[in-house]
Design a protein with these regions (language model features):
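Short glycine-/small-residue-rich Rossmann-like dinucleotide-binding loops
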Residues: 57, 210-214, 246-247
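Glycine-rich adenosine-cofactor-binding loop
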Residues: 8, 91-96, 103, 107, ...
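NAD(P)-binding Rossmann-fold cofactor-contacting core
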Residues: 166-185
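Phosphate/diphosphate ligand-binding glycine-rich loop within oxidoreductases
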Residues: 2-115, 122
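Rossmann-fold NAD(P) dinucleotide-binding segment
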Residues: 61, 216-243, 255
Length: 299
């Protein structure tokens, strides 16, 4: 029987095994391969597993070990999914598709289930195409996105936002890392902002994707007007979307969450990201579409 698993550190509290079991009714095994030595974990994959998911801090290490890549994975330069094939180890990035699906659901509730039922394993492609076109109608001017954090998840978020048609700014604790991404992907015309400009950038942008694992102090400085946005009454547009990767210990919580709601912004939990990257990624392992409703029960 084919075996699957997750590489990362720490991962002892990961929901991935439960999601995988729910998605396939226990048909396949899914193990946690935890440890700080990526080489040792990768050797375990080579010896015993058909496919693995990869989480922090190893997404860029995984990318470098692959023999070939899907198109967006190659562009992003990080992988959260490795699969053995007759042609070698394939790297994919279901963070990218998970982000696309999460944002699609935020702007158009119900679209994921509808498209999954209609298009099966190609649903994420159809969702991407449909939402990219639809967003041009939802906004009366070019929408703007801010991606905070430029690790593996941040790279995927930046490409996803740009692919959906957002003018995208990158922000990182070290601006040089953000600039490196911008230089590597000139086709997206990424802007690099300083972390000191976080509050002003949140107010200006329509979409904020926060991928840092920790909370920056400026989050607590955000007020209702920042979440409403600077052009709230000038241009018709959807509510501001705050999308956070960290579902275990979110940075947007407590009083700032109350101000977010008062400003009519929409918060999207990292649970959605986890769910939809699993949905679009697991099919690459098995060739079978997992049970989305059963996976939702895990969340």
């Amino acid at each position: 029987m084919n075996k699957f698993g997750l590489i990362g550190d720490p991962i002892s509290k990961s929901l991935s095994p439960a999601l995988f079991e729910a998605g396939y009714g226990g048909k396949y095994s899914y193990d946690l391969i935890e440890g700080s030595d990526f080489g040792a974990s990768f050797k375990a994959f080579e010896d015993r597993y058909k496919g693995i998911n990869v989480t922090a801090p190893f997404k860029e290490d995984a990318f470098r070990r692959a023999d070939f890549y899907t198109s967006y994975c190659k562009k992003i330069g990080a992988s959260n999914l490795l699969v053995k094939t007759p042609d070698g180890i394939m790297a994919d990035n279901s963070d990218f598709t998970g982000i696309i699906m999460s944002l699609a659901e935020a702007y158009m509730p119900g679209i994921v289930k509808q498209f999954c039922a209609k298009y099966g394993e190609s649903a994420h492609i159809k969702v991407h195409q449909f939402v990219k076109q639809a967003l041009t109608q939802l906004f009366s001017r070019k929408p703007q996105a801010l991606v905070v954090g430029c690790g593996g998840a941040g790279r995927a978020a930046a490409v996803a936002a740009a692919e959906l048609g957002f003018d995208t700014a990158l922000m990182n604790r070290t601006a040089e890392k953000a600039q490196k991404i911008a230089d590597e992907m000139p086709e997206y015309s990424f802007i690099v902002d300083q972390l000191t400009d976080f509050q002003a950038a949140v107010r200006e942008c329509d979409l904020i994707i926060y991928t840092l694992p920790m909370k920056i102090e400026d989050i607590d400085l955000l007020d209702v007007a920042d979440f409403e946005g600077e052009d709230r009454y000038q241009w018709p547009r959807p509510a501001k979307v705050i999308f956070e990767a960290n579902y275990k210990n979110p940075s947007f919580s407590g009083e700032v969450m109350e101000r977010l709601k008062e400003g009519d912004a929409q918060y999207v939990s990292g649970n959605k990201w986890l769910l939809y990257q699993a949905l679009t990624g697991y099919v690459k392992f098995t060739g079978e579409i997992p049970d989305l409703e059963a996976m939702e029960q895990v969340m």
